[in-house]
Every structure is written in C-alpha cells, then in structure tokens.
Amino acid sequence: GITDKRLMAHHKFNEHGTSKGIVERLKGGENVCLITDAGTPGISDPGFYLVREAIEAGVEVQTLPGATAFVPALVSSGLPCDKFCFEGFLPQKKGRQTRLEQLSRAPRTMIFYESPRRVVKTLEQLCKYFGEERRVSACREISKVYEESVRGTAKEVMEHFMETEPKGEFVIIVSGCTELQDYAAKADTESAKTAKPVRESKYQRKMREREEQDGETATL
C-alpha cells in the first residue's frame, strides 16, 4: 500500500481549489499521483480539471492503465462494441429530457452510469424516449461477488428491477437506433403523453416513502 506519503482529498466539491496548489507543487519538482477509490480518474470521477491545469502549466502528465466499469459491461452486454458513446450520469433534473430525446436517435451503442435509487426511473425513461423494444443490458457490481447482468428489452429490464430491488452501482448499455426503432420510439413518446403511469411496485413505494420522510431527492 501507500505509506509515508502525504495524502490529500481531491473531489468534485474542492477540485477547483486544490488543483492550483497541486499544480504549483508539480512545477516545484514534486511527483503527484492521482488515484480514485474505484474506477479511473476523469471517467465520471474527478481528474479532468487537474489534468487540464497541469498540461496548461507545462507539466508532464503520464497515465497508467486502470479499471473502468463501462468497458467490461459493454463487452459482456452482447450489443455492438465497434461504435459507442459514453454518457456517464444523465442530468438529474434540468436537461435530462432534452438529452434523452437527442440520444434516442443516436445510431451507436450508448453507455450510462446510474445509482440503484434511480435505475428504475431511468429505465422507465428509456422506455418512453427510446421505445420499449430497445435492447438493454443493465450490469451491476462489476468484478465483485454479486456481479449480475440483466439483458432484454428496455421494458423487460425495467419490469425486472420493479420486482427485484436494485443494489450496487449500475452500468446501463443501450443499443443504437435503427430507422424502425426511431419510428417506434416516436410513437411510444406520443403514446406516453396520454398513457397512465406505470404501476408503482412495492420497492418503488418504499423508496418514495423513505425519500419523502427524509425530505430529500434521490442523489448519489
């Protein structure tokens, strides 16, 4: 492990402030290693801002190969891997609907990260904007004891997690759009505007009641 070294926190709440000090130390001749407790820095984790500041300051940046959840999830999804886009976490509120509408017609495989508390909501929205028949693979707990991949249509995967409590962090892989799927997605979107809401499962009701009691929105 790392011993006798000075450690400091560098995260999304302080990275703009800490990056300047780190770059100054680098310019002074020190070596700095940026690591995360899981995944790879810069991939849905802090790192981009510090790397950019270091490069602009003329500091050499080297990268060691590291693990990132979306690659094994993509490979094991059974969906095309030759062309894909990594979207990470969708906007929680503002811009979420607009982004989903834009992506619904993308021809390449798409990759999303999601928390267990929002995964059912996201799958519902995929059904709404992408169409219920769009192929999806939802992978959780990658490389851990309880790793699981649920594959099927967006509707089938959604229904699975409406009845089975989602646990662990998720990677959701979605197939790209064909002309036929584009037509179906538009029809589903129009239908969803007048359709009755999806019946709430016991798990969803439990989570909603907990959130209302805590007085907070679902966040990571």
Residue ranges, per PLM feature:
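A charged, well-structured terminal subsegment
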Residues: 25, 95-111, 129, 180
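Short, well-ordered secondary-structure micro-motifs
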Residues: 20, 45, 73-75, 97-101, ...
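Class I SAM-dependent methyltransferase SAM-binding "motif I" and its flanking Rossmann-like core
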Residues: 49-106
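Conserved phosphate/pyrophosphate-binding and hydrolysis machinery centered on Walker-type P-loop NTPases
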Residues: 40, 44, 67, 90-93, ...
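Short, hinge-like loop/turn segments at secondary-structure boundaries
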Residues: 2-4, 24-26, 51-53, 77-82, ...
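Short hydrophobic/aromatic-enriched beta-strand-loop microsegments
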Residues: 3-11, 61-62, 81-88, 133-139
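Class I S-adenosyl-L-methionine
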Residues: 1-64
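A contiguous loop/helix-start segment that scaffolds small-molecule binding in enzyme catalytic cores
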Residues: 30-31, 109, 113-220
